[in-house]
């Protein structure tokens, strides 16, 4: 029986244990099928959002192990990659959407683009995120469920955060004097 090129779920199921052995999680898999030019792109990251991202040496070592694992699976008839493929292991880039709590924690202090504009992540606790709405005179803060703003993307910033915003980053959640996110409306802070 000829097996088809594996899909994302099959690859993730096959690779999860190996990637976890390196202390990493699979954040995403992208498959591009194009005959001999097919590509598999796997984004991995640390499970601990406060830990350093994997460096190039770790990615290179993991890439060798993943390649060997996939070659062995193909030789055993468990998967078929056809005419060949290119394997790319990477970490999530700045365009990677913030979906999980750990994504938000990793980016505390950074600007994010939301449906309603750009805000800064001040703090994350449980299911809530405190966002700073930039304002030259007096930035405002709001507390929302991060699930309500899932899909935000980090905004590249070329300068330091204004002092008024930087002072609000990383405070204990109750220091903001905000009600719980479930008590607030879903509308963004007023300008």
From Swiss-Prot:
Transmembrane segments: none annotated. The keyword Cytoplasm applies. Gene3D superfamilies: RimP-like superfamily, N-terminal. GO terms for cellular component: cytosol. It comes from the Bacteria. Belongs to the RimP family. Required for maturation of 30S ribosomal subunits. This is Ribosome maturation factor RimP. It comes from Corynebacterium jeikeium (strain K411).
């Amino acid at each position: 029986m000829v097996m088809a090129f594996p899909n994302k779920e099959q690859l993730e199921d096959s690779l999860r244990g190996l990637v976890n052995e390196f202390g990493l999680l699979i954040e995403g898999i992208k498959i591009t099928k194009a005959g001999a030019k097919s590509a598999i792109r796997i984004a991995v990251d640390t499970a601990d959002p406060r830990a350093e991202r994997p460096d190039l040496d770790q990615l290179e070592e993991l890439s060798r192990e993943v390649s060997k694992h996939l070659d062995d699976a193909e030789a055993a008839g468990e998967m078929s990659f056809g005419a060949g493929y290119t394997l790319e292991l990477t970490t999530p880039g700045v365009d990677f959407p913030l979906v999980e709590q750990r994504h938000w924690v990793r980016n505390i202090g950074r600007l994010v683009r939301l449906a309603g504009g750009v805000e800064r992540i001040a703090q994350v606790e449980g299911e809530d995120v405190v966002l700073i709405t930039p304002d030259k005179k007096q930035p405002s803060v709001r507390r929302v469920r991060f699930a309500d703003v899932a899909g935000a993307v980090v905004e590249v910033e070329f300068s330091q955060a204004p002092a008024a915003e930087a002072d609000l980053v990383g405070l204990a959640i109750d220091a903001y004097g905000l009600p719980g996110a479930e008590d607030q409306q879903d509308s963004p802070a007023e300008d």
